[in-house]
Every structure is written in C-alpha cells, then in structure tokens.
C-alpha cells in the first residue's frame, strides 16, 4: 500500500497529477482544490495517498493534507457517495465547510458539489452528523450535538449566517460564529440575537 508520494510534478490533468518519484511516475487522482494548490510542472510535491485496489486496477487518490484524506474516506461511508462524488465534494467545500454544513444540517451547501442531488445531500448531513467530531479536529468550532432540524438549517440560523456573510465575513467564519452563538443562546434563539452574539464572537 502506498501512503505518501514525495517527488516532482510531471503533469497536471483535469482530475489528476502525475508525480515522478525517482523515475517512476504515479497517477494520483485529486480534488480540484488539491490540484490548484499543488504547484507547477517541475516543482517538488508531497501527496498523502489513499490506495484503492480492485480486481482489474489499482488507483491512487492524492491529498495535500491527512485531514482531507480522512474526509474522503468518511464521505464514502454514505450510501451513494463513491470516490468521484467524494472528490467533487472536496473540490467544492473545504473540510471545515463540510463540517459546518453537516453540523448545521445545511444540505443546500452540500448539494453545490457536482453529482450531489438533494437525496444524497440529505443522507450526507444526516448520516455523518454524529461521525464528524472524530474527523473535524480543529476544522470547526461547532457544537455537533445540537439538534438543528431535519435536512436544512432552521430559518434563524440560516438568516444569521447569511447576515454575517453579507457583512463581509466568509461563510466558514459566519457558520463558526453562529454555532458559538447557539451554544450561548440555545436552539430557540431568533436571528437577531444570533447575529448579535455572532458579531461579539467575531470581535474577539
């Protein structure tokens, strides 16, 4: 099993990188986000690898960080999510954004990834809700044990996150701040209170 490649970028394709390791070139399939950060042809690179062995082929999937590789595997525990969809999700959302979307039960954010329809998005946010803490690490500050509804974030939460993003904060910052606000205000808080507490959190 190959766990990591350390070599030189030989080629970057639409969904893969060709890495030369001491004269042997390996094809590693990667998310668009990983490919964009990898560097240029001729530069040194390091990829953490997940190896898939099938009867007729061996495929390598490459990641810039171990956390991304863990999410790749976690996502595929959901019915309907294979390697291609998992990479599409990681191309669209960072691990932190995925953790936030799952904690907020925000299937709309998850369904932004190509190949992820409403049913698969709902399965992802539902089935992974209680599995995320083991993989999130420091990717998010959200309290994962909160019950935020079925399939979509409650209106006050969505409104509060939207309000903070309209003020110039990233969705990741806004979601983290509102999650922290909910710990203080409780699940029944209205959007105005969540926004106020969220801004207080962001000002720290």
Swiss-Prot record:
Residues 1-64 are annotated as: Domain I. Keywords: Cytoplasm, DNA damage, DNA recombination, DNA repair, DNA-binding. Transmembrane segments: none annotated. It is found in: Cytoplasm. It comes from the Bacteria. One of its GO terms (biological process) is DNA recombination. Residues 144-151 are annotated as: Flexible linker. Residues 152-204 are annotated as: Domain III. Homotetramer. Forms an RuvA(8)-RuvB(12)-Holliday junction (HJ) complex. HJ DNA is sandwiched between 2 RuvA tetramers; dsDNA enters through RuvA and exits via RuvB. An RuvB hexamer assembles on each DNA strand where it exits the tetramer. Each RuvB hexamer is contacted by two RuvA subunits (via domain III) on 2 adjacent RuvB subunits; this complex drives branch migration. In the full resolvosome a probable DNA-RuvA(4)-RuvB(12)-RuvC(2) complex forms which resolves the HJ. The RuvA-RuvB-RuvC complex processes Holliday junction (HJ) DNA during genetic recombination and DNA repair, while the RuvA-RuvB complex plays an important role in the rescue of blocked DNA replication forks via replication fork reversal (RFR). RuvA specifically binds to HJ cruciform DNA, conferring on it an open structure. The RuvB hexamer acts as an ATP-dependent pump, pulling dsDNA into and through the RuvAB complex. HJ branch migration allows RuvC to scan DNA until it finds its consensus sequence, where it cleaves and resolves the cruciform DNA. Belongs to the RuvA family. Has three domains with a flexible linker between the domains II and III and assumes an 'L' shape. Domain III is highly mobile and contacts RuvB. This is Holliday junction branch migration complex subunit RuvA.
């Amino acid at each position: 099993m190959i766990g990591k490649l350390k070599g030189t970028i030989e080629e970057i394709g639409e969904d893969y990188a060709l890495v030369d390791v001491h004269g042997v070139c390996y094809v590693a399939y990667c998310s668009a986000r990983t490919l964009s950060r990898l560097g240029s042809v001729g530069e040194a690179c390091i990829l953490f690898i997940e190896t898939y062995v099938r009867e007729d082929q061996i495929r390598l999937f490459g990641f810039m960080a171990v956390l991304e590789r863990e999410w790749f595997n976690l996502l595929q525990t959901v019915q309907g999510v294979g390697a291609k969809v998992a990479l599409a999700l990681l191309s669209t959302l960072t691990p932190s954004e995925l953790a936030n979307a799952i904690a907020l039960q925000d299937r709309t954010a998850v369904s932004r990834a190509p190949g992820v329809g409403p049913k698969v998005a709902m399965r992802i946010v539902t089935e992974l809700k209680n599995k995320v803490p083991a993989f999130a690490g420091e990717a998010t500050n959200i309290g994962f044990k909160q019950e935020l509804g079925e399939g979509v974030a409650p209106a006050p939460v969505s409104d509060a996150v939207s309000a903070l993003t309209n003020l110039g904060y990233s969705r990741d910052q806004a979601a983290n701040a509102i999650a922290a606000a909910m710990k203080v205000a409780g699940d029944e808080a209205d959007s105005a209170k969540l926004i106020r507490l969220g801004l207080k959190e962001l000002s720290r």
